[in-house]
């Protein structure tokens, strides 16, 4: 907490806060809980469209799928904990986002894991990678929620660090919606789930500052302990309780623990709460009221219920062998009061906890973009370098550890542009996530716009009409003027792109202070999106003899590209989004799919058309022959990462009809035993078996597993 903030608290309180009050205020005034550096700017994001039932402000967003089905979606980061203790940090990140979905009254049905690490050549980065994935796998598999997609990226700026973002979607009936706030006094507060221990104490304050060199030893106690078996019981018990209609409000105990959950639940509508901290079931002897109030022990939920309904719900909790305790009540006076064995140990105006002043840090614009000339390298050599990049090869090593088919909804599985989950007999939910810190580092505004555009492309590639977005903004310290400027530019880019597509952000998260020993991470906005697709319309894959076509314009845009990364080129111009072209092409793709004119669609993104075509070959074990002519260098064309582009495959007899819908360029054909790419007479030729071996197995080779 800043000295000026301590002064504001003393003035508003009229006295010095005691030890317990100070600890609670430190938690609630932390960046992680209060969003004090970002709240002003987040208001720029669009939060409403025809599909939105409930936007930002609660634990997750709610989107209308149809009259009888709502989708709940949220996104969270667990960056600091995962950098310090990768297994526990990642696992508890999954647990937290699942409870965010659960406390809206929805059953969690799928997870995504956008995760980022330093180069795999270093042992520490391999250790972080291996144990983050293991933490996600063990927790998700044990609670029975499939991890159906995500991203895995490696970047030099993340050396000895990791960005672990997690997305969860849930499904619910409209009548089961539960809010995270109360609207009347007299309700009892019932704490359900795991006992409270000392793990996670000061977790949110630790997540609101940069890591030191010795963080692994110093901050391990701030990382929570995962217990997926209790979480599974908590999921079933919570849903059964919600279905009784007797739950008046519900919060999970995440960052800030009981202090945050109870004060936010009571304070939103101007009410207060009394907490009897000595009634909280404890895991460890000798805990103090301070520790109880700010512990972030996992797998705990706070229910607000009428006094006469406590026993009925208690029977449900006991059926699942979950501990429960009435730990407080909602009062009319807007105060937050804590008792410990009959003594009042804290008494604060509730708005002092929930109404934290915003901070505007100084900003300094930076310019990194400069036009650079790509070195003269043979197309075939450039292809070999890019195709074997850890950012390009299949992440099968990751998703094979996940049970991505549990619950039986997964129609399109990990590895494609978007996953699809069956919602009913006719429709599915498409879900995807994207981020590109290399673009955002060069140009935060245009990089952010590109992130949204790629989410849209990934959704429409499987035939889905986009419904809504969530965002996770991963940045270094906002106290750095360049970082704060890049954050604001990113938010503006996210806002402008979403408005252009008539999309709304229904939930989100901001994670600042992502740096280790004065080494900041690149600006990394991650956007996840959901869409609605007719199951019968999903393109199933190219057929032998199909024509290959390109939709969209290729420009010389290689700044932040995978080609420049493998060549060690830092400059260049980040790709720009032409919103009109992007929207028009997305609508054209949906039209082509609805009219059954295409057999497959793949968006062109990282690695350009060269990689998009090679992926087509590797995914389906088919030959691909494609030929292009361009006014710029062969490798510039092949590896340009211009937005707004798609590779489509279609039967030859559908080409003319397709041309009436979309501006398509015929570039090749599916068939044969080879992958053959030609640009301006330069050729890349690969045996399918060799191409596929690198794509599917190279990650295992890198990890020496």
UniProtKB/Swiss-Prot annotation:
Residues holding Mg(2+) 1: 76, 509
InterPro entries the record matches: PRibForGlyAmidine_synth_PurL, PurL_linker, PurM-like_C_dom, PurM-like_C_sf, PurM-like_N, PurM-like_N_sf
Q: Which parts of the sequence bind ATP?
A: 35, 471, 508
State the pathway, as annotated in the record: Purine metabolism; IMP biosynthesis via de novo pathway; 5-amino-1-(5-phospho-D-ribosyl)imidazole from N(2)-formyl-N(1)-(5-phospho-D-ribosyl)glycinamide: step 1/2
Any Pfam family: FGAR-AT_linker
Catalysed reactions, as listed in the record: N(2)-formyl-N(1)-(5-phospho-beta-D-ribosyl)glycinamide + L-glutamine + ATP + H2O = 2-formamido-N(1)-(5-O-phospho-beta-D-ribosyl)acetamidine + L-glutamate + ADP + phosphate + H(+)
| UniProt key word rRNA processing | no
Instruction: Tell me its EC number(s), please.
Output: 6.3.5.3
Which positions in this protein are listed as binding Mg(2+) 2?
Answer: 100, 252
Does Magnesium show up as a keyword for this record?
yes
The GO annotation for biological process reads: 'de novo' IMP biosynthetic process
MF (Gene Ontology): ATP binding; magnesium ion binding; phosphoribosylformylglycinamidine synthase activity
Primary role: Part of the phosphoribosylformylglycinamidine synthase complex involved in the purines biosynthetic pathway. Catalyzes the ATP-dependent conversion of formylglycinamide ribonucleotide (FGAR) and glutamine to yield formylglycinamidine ribonucleotide (FGAM) and glutamate. The FGAM synthase complex is composed of three subunits. PurQ produces an ammonia molecule by converting glutamine to glutamate. PurL transfers the ammonia molecule to FGAR to form FGAM in an ATP-dependent manner.
**Which PANTHER family does the record match to this protein?**
PHOSPHORIBOSYLFORMYLGLYCINAMIDINE SYNTHASE SUBUNIT PURL (PTHR43555:SF1)
Subunit architecture: Monomer. Part of the FGAM synthase complex composed of 1 PurL, 1 PurQ and 2 PurS subunits.
Provide the family line.
Belongs to the FGAMS family.
Q: What is this protein called?
A: Phosphoribosylformylglycinamidine synthase subunit PurL
Question: What gene is behind this protein?
Answer: purL
